């Protein structure tokens, strides 16, 4: 056992037990708790870690580029993207026998390979890459970028280059920089790549380092830009007959507003995507000039927030809502946990939206027909969104424990939220019970009547409000005649008066899985409410954890016990499981439960449509046994049969992962149910045996072995539960989809 310990916490170094290891892991990244930590040092360390994070991302991208260029089949994919299965990398495994070697030698490879379900091939193809050489060049560039960002991280820890605390807390300048430079410039730079490289390549015109200065992206050049004749850039778009990657049917437009999908690539029009990026880049650059700069021009955030109150002489409420946002500016500025919570919540919502839109409005050429990749990407992004959202509430709770100042926030919105927490929490509890009892009640009723041979007695509710929303966006099948589904409405007349061709109505009324809004019925209505139950229950646990973080009637001094504590002292057994950490821990189980329902729904509905059997979802999705039998059991069949006495197949690895995932998941329960005393006794018995066994007793250790604390065991249990859950469902999604569609 190590005798030295990192210098960040001398208290750990004195601990005579194996707790040191666990507390070391727990506090390694809790910079605030480290010895000798000042606020300025804290900000500098965090700023430096951002560059390290960027380096890891750049290295990961470089690795993907390198291995696909080296071992993949990108150039073959470019020639036939709808039929060539993309290769992620080769497999070199000394354990492979002839059966598995043969099974994994696929997609035209000469040896065993893994198939890529990441969508990287489609992305690189869409943005104009065509050769392995280009992938290698990009890989080298990303590797250099990783080195450069690592150097930047190191540099900003050196005395001469450490930013000051005042620099970090200059909110207006930081917002201006992030909005205008990071978001604005990068969006316009991406427009540049799309216009100069991707769009010409999609029209069969090669643009590379050899000719990029001589190939005009538009016949008129910059003349329309300087003469304000911007409409010229939208004229002569690609036709509906255009063959992606060739000049056949190609136009010359670079910024369009066509809507819908390119008929052949079944992805958004590249010229629409370019238009989106230049528009949003322009908006961000304008936004990056809103806040007060070093010349005193622009808005002060403090003035804006403090103007948002009810003390204005013309305000009808006359201060009845307290002082609203006074103190909020200082609270957010001085709390990294508050800022992180806001950032995680925003990013969590954005990631969930990305998951939805990658399926509903695919932006990469031909990816919509790679059903396994689409399923994997949806699942991947929804799971990430879940982790980000739980993290947002976790850091919100840490803010209340560590950073909240009751004096500074007296009678403002934060104090008012804390003051009305009983009403908030009890209402959420009521909502979850209403949703839970009604949804489960209808599902179980339907199960019973189907089991007894009376399926016509099911309670089937049409989602009329959601159907109305779909109709308003132009879906004709429901017969609602609202807004865009009514040809005579003001919305339709305005849409029809737009110059040029527009294809939104074609997209929304498609009969396949690419319709922007899929048809919905009673099965969708029920699972929607099941998902709403999961969302509200997760939110209830997390919001309660944050709002109760400082104290409750049961434990008034909770804030002094910290973010994570097992129980409030001996003899007060009723106080266990009440820390904010415990709320996060419990919410994780509900969040995993919820995200499974979300992805089950998306996956099954799409499988049914892709197979031309949409009735399966519509009819079986209205009762629980239908979900268990026709989705879970039916699609597990390939996994359970992945390898058998007659040999193996290309799904074997997923079958093994499916089984292994269940094992990891089940291991979690050992830590979640068996608690400390049992383990402590077992450890002491094992130590006794070790010390009396020849040869083994030559190895000793300094630390007294101690069982995991309740909080530590919960962390280990939750980690196994989560990782097992993801391994199991990931293998299920990929194998069940690729087993049907390749």
UniProtKB/Swiss-Prot annotation:
Q: Gene3D superfamilies, alphabetically?
A: Photosystem I PsaA/PsaB
Q: Which residues bind divinyl chlorophyll a B3?
A: 670, 678
Query: Which InterPro entries does the record cross-reference, listed alphabetically?
Result: PSI_PsaA/B, PSI_PsaA/B_CS, PSI_PsaA/B_sf, PSI_PsaB
**What processes in GO biological process is this protein linked to?**
photosynthesis
Regions crossing the membrane: 46-69, 135-158, 175-199, 273-291, 336-359, 375-401, 423-445, 525-543, 583-604, 651-673, 715-735
Compartmental location? Cellular thylakoid membrane
* Positions of phylloquinone binding: 679
Residues that coordinate or bind divinyl chlorophyll a B1: 662
Q: Which superkingdom does the taxonomy of this entry point to? A: Bacteria
Bilayer disposition of the protein: Multi-pass membrane protein
Query: Which reaction does this chain catalyze?
Result: reduced [plastocyanin] + hnu + oxidized [2Fe-2S]-[ferredoxin] = oxidized [plastocyanin] + reduced [2Fe-2S]-[ferredoxin]
Task: Return the EC number.
Answer: 1.97.1.12
Cellular component, GO, one term:
plasma membrane-derived thylakoid membrane
Matching entries from PROSITE patterns are given as: PHOTOSYSTEM_I_PSAAB
The record's function comment reads: PsaA and PsaB bind P700, the primary electron donor of photosystem I (PSI), as well as the electron acceptors A0, A1 and FX. PSI is a plastocyanin/cytochrome c6-ferredoxin oxidoreductase, converting photonic excitation into a charge separation, which transfers an electron from the donor P700 chlorophyll pair to the spectroscopically characterized acceptors A0, A1, FX, FA and FB in turn. Oxidized P700 is reduced on the lumenal side of the thylakoid membrane by plastocyanin or cytochrome c6.
Task: Tell me the subunit arrangement.
Answer: The PsaA/B heterodimer binds the P700 divinyl chlorophyll special pair and subsequent electron acceptors. PSI consists of a core antenna complex that captures photons, and an electron transfer chain that converts photonic excitation into a charge separation. The cyanobacterial PSI reaction center is composed of one copy each of PsaA,B,C,D,E,F,I,J,K,L,M and X, and forms trimeric complexes.
Family membership, please give it: Belongs to the PsaA/PsaB family.
Which HAMAP family does the entry link to?
PSI_PsaB
| Listed NCBIfam families | psaB
Protein name listed in UniProt: Photosystem I P700 chlorophyll a apoprotein A2
Q: Which organism is it from?
A: Prochlorococcus marinus subsp. pastoris (strain CCMP1986 / NIES-2087 / MED4)
* High-level lineage: Bacteria, Bacillati, Cyanobacteriota, Cyanophyceae, Synechococcales
Instruction: Provide the gene name from the record.
Output: psaB
